[in-house]
């Protein structure tokens, strides 16, 4: 039985289908969600089940702050303030916000996966080990700061390069074989991205 294309919601017949993200699409419906560029199965990024071209769209929308879209993995990291050294002890609430915090309740600590370093200079928490990430040891990916050794594939544990890996539900994965095996179309050939063995028409019926 023919499946429905997730882009146009129309029937996808065997001769016109491509498979990606575990779904069957019309060839020309597999487009970047942001710029509408036609994509190749296995040759694009994914976010919340939607396809995106790797650059510039995925890097611009979901990459770390300051990403250089001219080359994956090239980043301009924020420099620590020269006037305010990094705080290693308890966080102090700035004077300018004291009254505002009093009105809204007691101050809260930083989020474990804050996407940017807060303006007081205190380091963020690594989403992998839940420990503080200081400027000299951090890499930024998926909008979070990680220790360099902590940015690893969720499945195989391989160390990854910022901007050079896939993402699913906010977790990093190496493009192949792990992302292809877990989330790629059925029959993915992990030896070469974009090489697929499509399912034959299960009923062996001729095209309408």
UniProtKB/Swiss-Prot annotation:
Q: N6-acetyllysine: which positions carry it? A: 23, 138, 144
Report if keyword Membrane is assigned.
Answer: no
Q: Provide any one GO MF term from the record.
A: metal ion binding
Residue ranges annotated as transmembrane are: none
Provide ranges: composition bias, Low complexity: 104-115
InterPro entries referenced in this protein's UniProt entry, alphabetically: Znf_LIM (IPR001781)
Q: Does the UniProt entry include the keyword Transferase?
A: no
Q: Which residues carry this modification: Phosphoserine?
A: 104
The record describes its quaternary structure and partners as:
Interacts with TGFB1I1.
Q: What is this protein called?
A: Cysteine-rich protein 2
């Amino acid at each position: 039985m023919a499946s429905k294309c997730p882009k146009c919601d129309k029937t996808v017949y065997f001769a016109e289908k491509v498979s990606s993200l575990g779904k069957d699409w019309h060839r020309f419906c597999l487009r970047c969600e942001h710029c509408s560029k036609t994509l190749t199965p296995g040759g694009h990024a994914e976010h919340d089940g939607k396809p995106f071209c790797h650059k510039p769209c995925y890097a611009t929308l979901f990459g770390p702050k300051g990403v250089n879209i001219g080359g994956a993995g090239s980043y301009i990291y924020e420099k620590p303030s020269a006037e305010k050294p990094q705080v290693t002890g308890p966080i102090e609430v700035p004077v300018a916000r004291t009254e505002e915090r009093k009105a809204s309740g007691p101050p809260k600590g930083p989020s474990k996966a804050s996407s940017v370093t807060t303006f007081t200079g205190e380091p963020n928490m690594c989403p992998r080990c839940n420990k503080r990430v200081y400027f000299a040891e951090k890499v930024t990916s998926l909008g979070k700061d990680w220790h360099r050794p902590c940015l690893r594939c969720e499945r195989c544990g391989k160390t990854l390069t910022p901007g050079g890996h896939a993402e699913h539900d906010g977790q990093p994965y190496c493009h192949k074989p792990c992302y292809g095996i877990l989330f790629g179309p059925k029959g993915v050939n992990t030896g070469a991205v974009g090489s697929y063995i499509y399912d034959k028409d299960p009923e062996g019926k001729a095209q309408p």
